[in-house]
Structures are given as C-alpha cells and as structure tokens.
Amino acid sequence: MDEADVISKLEALGKKLPHFSDGRINYTNTDYAPVICVFIRFDNQILLLKRSGKVSNYKGKWNAITGFIDKPEPLKEKALGEVEEETGITKELIKEVILGTPYELPDDEINKTWLVCPFVIELNSRPKIKLDFESTEYKWIKPEQLNAPDTVRDLGKSYAACLKT
C-alpha cells in the first residue's frame, strides 16, 4: 500500500461518512479510520506522548504523535501539521521526513481497523516540547522500548514500517 492507495481510500470514505461543519470526515461511529502515526527521533531516541483523558481512544497510554486523516491533503503535510499542533515542533527543527509503508491494524477491543500511515521525523536538535490537550506528559525512549505494556498496541510495528523503506 502506498500514499495513492491511502488517498483513494480516504476519498471513498469521504463519500459515505458524515462530515463535521468544517468539512472534515467524521470517523466517530465507523469501524475503519485512516491515521498518521509520527515518530519524532533525535539522538537515537523517540519522543512519546501520554494520551490525556480528553481523547477518544487509548487514554493514559503512551503513543507517537497521531491524528485522523480527515481531509484530502498530502500525508507529509498532515504529519507536519499534527507534529506542530501536538508538540510545538516547527519545520525549522526538522532534518528529514520518512514516510513508512501504510498498513491496516485491526483493534477488536474497540471494533475499529486503523489504516496506519507511519512517519519518522528526524530532528536537528532536541526541541522544547509544548503539549496540547491531547497529551499530559512526554518522554524520550530508546526504539526497543516501543512495545512496553503502557504503550498503544503494535507501536513498534508502526516504527518498523518506516525502517523498511
């Protein structure tokens, strides 16, 4: 699966699902949703954010930066927008952006299949993090810690999907 396949699925979903007043696709009551999953990397460490009680899924779990792909736009633009929104990291701090291989991840516990579009963003320097309402804490970890029990499931799989490209 590649970016064109993701956009094609997004367009099909946009035709059958409801929309918010601003035009974004509403995935609230659907069993399938495309998302970006962005790993911020600096000095061989990965930034994780602890999900707040104000998000709909995986409250209290550690995760990469994520967001619904709820309107047609290039995936890189969506990833960069989510990164700045959730952490305050701007384009000036970014050394490299890598799009991994998108894949489907079923989660039977919440009856939803995620179409995960993973990214790794390599930074030039360690940034000052400014969290928004979606997260309560942040930490830097080694990549081998991505599948710890307090992270969202298969987080390591999403990261690995970026290393194969």
Question: Where are each of the predicted segments found?
Answer:
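Nudix hydrolase/Nudix homology domain
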Residues: D2, K59-G60, K112, P118, ...
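Acidic, metal-coordinating catalytic segment for phosphate/diphosphate chemistry
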Residues: D2-C37
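Conserved beta-strand and immediately adjacent loop positions that scaffold enzyme active sites
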Residues: C37, Q45, E137
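Conserved Nudix-box catalytic region and its N-terminal flanking loop in Nudix hydrolases
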Residues: F42-E85
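Active-site-adjacent beta-strand/loop module that shapes the phosphate/pyrophosphate-binding cleft
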Residues: N44, T101-K128
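Glycine-centered C-terminal helix-capping/turn motifs at helix ends
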Residues: G88-I89, W140
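A short coil-to-beta-strand element that immediately follows conserved catalytic motifs
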Residues: T90-G100
